Design a protein with these regions (language model features):
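Catalytic strand-loop segment that frames the active site of acyl-thioester-processing enzymes
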Residues: 1-46, 50, 155-220
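HotDog/MaoC-like acyl-thioester-processing domains
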Residues: 2-16, 73-83, 87-167, 244, ...
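A short, polar/charged loop/turn motif at coil->beta-strand junctions and beta-hairpin connectors
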Residues: 9-14, 61-66, 174-178, 231-236
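Hydrophobic pocket/interface hotspot
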Residues: 29, 88, 132, 192-194, ...
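Short alpha-helical elements of helix-turn-helix
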Residues: 34, 72, 242
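An N-terminal domain-cap segment
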Residues: 55-78
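A short, amphipathic edge element
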Residues: 67-70, 85, 235-239
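Structured core of small recognition/catalytic domains
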Residues: 180-284
Length: 321
């Protein structure tokens, strides 16, 4: 039985059930970060449909529920074929916004024990699509919501810095490195033409491997393209908070810029910015806690004192999100 079920909290909803499909897993051999977020996105939609907003995610709807901030905490790997389930609940209901939490769990083992794979916390807004402004929740939803207690759930290692979305020039002035670029595709958008958070996570995921200053040990070892002992370590994401600043749409160009905020022996904090290279505006900013994983032992590797000293030389004192 799930720990949440055993607490007798009826506000939790079984909002998604499936598995980690092989093609969703990356070169590290586990579910890629974007697909944790994608499954949580489905769970959030299922939750609000269940709460009475049946048309909120259909094309042509007058209003929707949109994620403004999202924090993911990875706790246990989901390897190919892993059976997973998500339960979701509302932890706070404001006038026009709400806080929602999703708990992704592995299927019970032979002894009935359930292990949490990840948690996703979202701050969402009720949006009128004609004006793109937040407006009050309907009474039917207010009557349907049962607030859940999510104490002890969520990220713990992220720095408490504000994310205000500096523009491209400001990001460059901070000393961040350009690690990714491309153009958003139609397949990355929701029913209303906005690029989904799962794609923003994914674009960051496929770019951060170029961030040599954040992961010098994996570059020195040859990364995953190396051979033998050199290919046994790789950077891994542990927690990340994303804040959306301006809507991104298909056909819009983007760049990913990254910087090192702080470094410790076992983990390091990074800041990523996804910006429009044409207007300079910020689409989103992300603060992450990452580490280096031994791919054979499947656990984090601590930096030696000398390696940590070298890594800390790459910290950007004025870096913000």
């Amino acid at each position: 039985m799930s720990p949440l079920e055993s607490g007798g909290q009826s506000g939790w909803l079984a909002s998604w059930k499936g598995e980690a499909v092989n093609w969703e897993c990356d070169e590290l051999g586990h579910l890629n970060m974007r697909h944790y977020v994608g499954k949580a996105e489905e769970a959030r939609q299922f939750l609000f449909i269940h709460l009475g907003l049946a048309h909120a995610y259909r094309a042509g709807a007058p209003s929707t529920v949109r994620t403004r901030e999202l924090t993911v905490c990875y706790l246990r790997e989901a390897r190919p074929g892993a059976r997973l389930a998500i339960r979701s609940g509302v932890t706070r209901l404001g006038e026009v916004d709400a806080d929602v939490v999703h708990v992704m769990e592995h299927a019970p083992d032979a002894h009935g024990n359930v292990r949490v794979a990840a948690t996703v916390e979202e701050r969402v807004e009720h949006i009128a699509l004609r004006t793109q402004a937040a407006f009050a929740w309907p009474q039917r939803l207010r009557k349907a919501v049962r607030i859940v207690d999510a104490g002890g759930i969520g990220a713990r290692g992220l720095p408490g810095i504000d994310a205000f979305g500096p523009d491209r020039d400001a990001v460059i002035a901070m000393g961040a490195d350009r690690v990714g670029a491309g153009v958003f595709r139609a397949s990355e958008a929701d029913a209303f033409g906005h690029i989904r958070p799962t794609s923003l996570f994914g674009r960051c995921s496929e770019s951060v491997g170029h961030f040599r200053k954040g992961f010098p040990e994996t570059h020195a070892a040859g990364g995953l393209s190396g051979h033998g002992a050199a290919a046994r370590v790789s950077g891994v994401l542990l927690e990340m908070r994303l804040v959306r600043h301006a809507p991104a749409a298909p056909g819009r160009a983007f760049e990913v810029w990254s910087g090192l905020l702080e470094a410790r022996a076992a983990t390091r904090n990074l800041v990523h910015h996804i910006v429009d290279p044409v207007s300079g505006a910020s689409f989103a900013s992300m603060v992450a806690t990452s580490g280096v994983m031994d791919l054979e032992r499947r656990r984090l590797v601590k930096s030696t004192p000398d390696a940590l000293e070298r890594l800390r030389r790459n910290v950007l004192p004025g870096l913000t999100a």
